Amino acid sequence: MAKTSMKAREVKRAQLVAKYAEKRAALKAIIVSPASSDEDRWDAVLKLQALPRDSSASRKRNRCNQTGRPHGFLRKFGLSRIKLREATMRGEVPGLRKASW
């Protein structure tokens, strides 16, 4: 189990990412655009740097919904490999079963 504070930190990051997503996208579009002047581009870079660090989507970490485990996370199910295996063995995941060949 991950610490409660770590789970809370990830929730806070997710909220910040959602809050600043449009602003970040607009600033990045200005930076990448060949039509924008050097002054506009530099101004956009400074504004982007002024945004909260945790508002960047790359800082968000996928975590297991049940345990908060950061490694072995499977996006399709939202669970870590361990919890997915346990749920599969109980028959809670439709269409998923233990492999045998």
Swiss-Prot record:
Membrane-spanning intervals of the chain: none
Domain of life: Bacteria
Keywords, comma-separated and alphabetical: Ribonucleoprotein, Ribosomal protein, RNA-binding, rRNA-binding
SUPFAM superfamilies: Glucocorticoid receptor-like (DNA-binding domain)
InterPro entries cross-referenced by the UniProt entry: Ribosomal_uS14 (IPR001209), Ribosomal_uS14_bac/plastid (IPR023036), Ribosomal_uS14_CS (IPR018271)
Gene Ontology cellular component annotations, sorted alphabetically: cytoplasm; small ribosomal subunit
Coiled coil: none
GO MF: rRNA binding; structural constituent of ribosome
Stored HAMAP family: Ribosomal_uS14_1 (MF_00537)
UniProt function note: Binds 16S rRNA, required for the assembly of 30S particles and may also be responsible for determining the conformation of the 16S rRNA at the A site.
Family of this protein: Belongs to the universal ribosomal protein uS14 family.
Binding partners and assembly: Part of the 30S ribosomal subunit. Contacts proteins S3 and S10.
Name of the protein: Small ribosomal subunit protein uS14
